[in-house]
Amino acid sequence: MAAPWRRWPTGLLAVLRPLLTCRPLQGTTLQRDVLLFEHDRGRFFTILGLFCAGQGVFWASMAVAAVSRPPVPVQPLDAEVPNRGPFDLRSALWRYGLAVGCGAIGALVLGAGLLFSLRSVRSVVLRAGGQQVTLTTHAPFGLGAHFTVPLKQVSCMAHRGEVPAMLPLKVKGRRFYFLLDKTGHFPNTKLFDNTVGAYRSL
């Protein structure tokens, strides 16, 4: 029977083996580009862009109509001008307030649609060498926009199994999270989890 002091290196190796195999693959040299994520929703974002543009035009026209002075009917010289009080919807205060409100709603709809389009990720590609990653977003009207950043500047804020719908991705130097829809395709889940899907302190 082996002595206890001879068995502990074997037990220690058995404990450390999963940790060694789960280390990030940042040092692994890739010979070619590898697709890590893909989710093409070009048609949806085209419709979303048209909807937001239509809403912007509608609310802008409402703001212009509100600020325009209504025509004043011709009245006899001896006619008495009625006092409508401060709640008259034709007063300047109400018209300018309504114009500002309509403009704010239109800007909010346009801004939300633009931001969602620019932060919804269509594909993630790990470049050859494993040190650069290219993110492609849907962009307004589904036209697509891409950029390449060092892998060390990308941090996944949650594991794929921890979120129900959207996977938040943080890129250093860029505001707001980039969103990966979990219904998309992950061709290489292990490589994704060890590279782009890993958490980093940025």
UniProtKB/Swiss-Prot annotation:
Keywords: Membrane, Mitochondrion, Mitochondrion inner membrane, Transmembrane, Transmembrane helix. It is found in: Mitochondrion inner membrane. It comes from Homo sapiens (Human). The keyword Nucleus does not apply. Residues 65-97 are mitochondrial intermembrane. Belongs to the TMEM223 family. Residues 1-43, 119-202 are mitochondrial matrix. This is Transmembrane protein 223. Its main location: mitochondrion. InterPro entries: Tmem223 (IPR026100), TMEM70/TMEM186/TMEM223 (IPR045325).
